[in-house]
Amino acid sequence: MTDSKINVAILGVGNCASSFVQGLEYYKSEQDENGLISDVIGGYRVSDIEVVCAFDINKSKVGKDLSEAIFEEPNNTVKFAEVPNLGVNVKPGKVLDGIGKFVEDIIDPTEDSENVIKDLKESGAEILINLLPVGSDEAVKFYADCAIAANVGLSL
């Protein structure tokens, strides 16, 4: 096993992010690895993954701790794990494309942030996990460029 952490940033605090963050907490506290292909990969356990930064464009999520933001509407993922305060306030992203027609009337977008690269660097993130909605082509390109500039890997 390794003593080091994998510091990740989340791009898009929607239902997938909610399941991911809850899953991290669930498997950190459970001795049972049911549902995992393997409890150790490359010397790392689920408990070695730490979310250090998150971005979203929805005003109802930005500025809140990630543990709260993952349950904000329009998210509707079933709550299956208790998520303590993570000390990770959701940062504003940049509004480009990818806001679906079913949520465009629900989401109140933030003002664009020019600090994505700075936020990634300051957080110590090693990997930016892309959880943006399908159709976010321009947004993915923008955040890929930000990840490159911040020397952070990008998981599509």
Predicted regions and their residues:
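Beta-strand-loop-alpha-helix segment that lines the small-molecule cofactor/substrate pocket
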Residues: V134, F142-L156
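N-terminal glycine-/serine-/threonine-rich beta1-alpha1-beta2 phosphate-ribose binding loop
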Residues: M1-S136, V140-F142
